[in-house]
Amino acid sequence: EEESMGKLLLTGVDGNLGQLAADVLLTLEPVENLIFCGYNEESLKKYAEKGVETHVTNFNNPDGLVEAFKGADALALISMPFVGAKRQNAHKNAVDAAKAAGVKQIIYTSLVNADDETNPSVEKKDHIYTEKYIKEVGLDYQFMRNSQYAEAMVTNYFTYAHMNAPLTNSQGDGLMAYISRKDCAKALAYALHEFHHKVWNINGLELMTISTFCAIGDVSTGNHVPFVNVTDEENYQIWDAMGVPRTTDGVFLKDSEAPFSS
């Protein structure tokens, strides 16, 4: 039984989440059970040196994906760092290739409440699409519905602290259970390591408003960053003024305080 088991494949090992998940996986599995894929050849080298099978993959282009995924039983698909039709297409390419390569299960990093279609955020639509598509092609799945990474919000907090300005956005008094990216990575690695058929909600312990988050930041750092609520449109204008592109296809400023799109 054991010998017929295929390998475990992790995509996106050159990204923040993927790198953390790769490190956990290496403590759980022998290297000969693993395949690591990434966009950036340089970042794959250290794993190849350890004896892990590695492949350079670009999900925007389906060429070569089936070959890269061959021999894997389970594949962890970390969602792409862009939004909209481009991301949906990239995810579709990866899922199609997994199916064609004989992969049995996809473990996909989705978003908390992805199945709640009453909240049609731009970010969420891609996750709804990908979850549905994985089911449609008939692959077994685990969905890791991750909450907002705490680290991203800490970066956001310091952006405003450095500008000596209030943290301004349209979150209002919305509640969020922030969670460390490290915990999400650990959950992903274990989901790949142990077979389940499940939708996981990967949440922080405590729901809090952004005001509470800022207050915790103030106590921890000695800064003073109050929260100011604005409309979505006003929020876009603030980011525009900082030179932040509105979409992930926009031009990112080098060394920007805000390395993301609005």
Positions of PLM-derived features:
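Rossmann-fold cofactor-recognition segment
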Residues: 48-61
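Oxidoreductase cofactor-interface core, primarily capturing Rossmann-like NAD(P)-dependent enzymes
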Residues: 6-44, 60-63, 70, 81-92, ...
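Short, Lys/Arg-enriched N-terminal segments with co-localized hydrophobic residues
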Residues: 1-5
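A short hydrophobic/small-residue beta-strand
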Residues: 54, 105-106
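N-terminal Rossmann-like NAD(P) cofactor-binding module of classical short-chain dehydrogenase/reductase
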Residues: 69, 73-76, 107
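A hydrophobic C-terminal alpha-helical subdomain
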Residues: 232-262
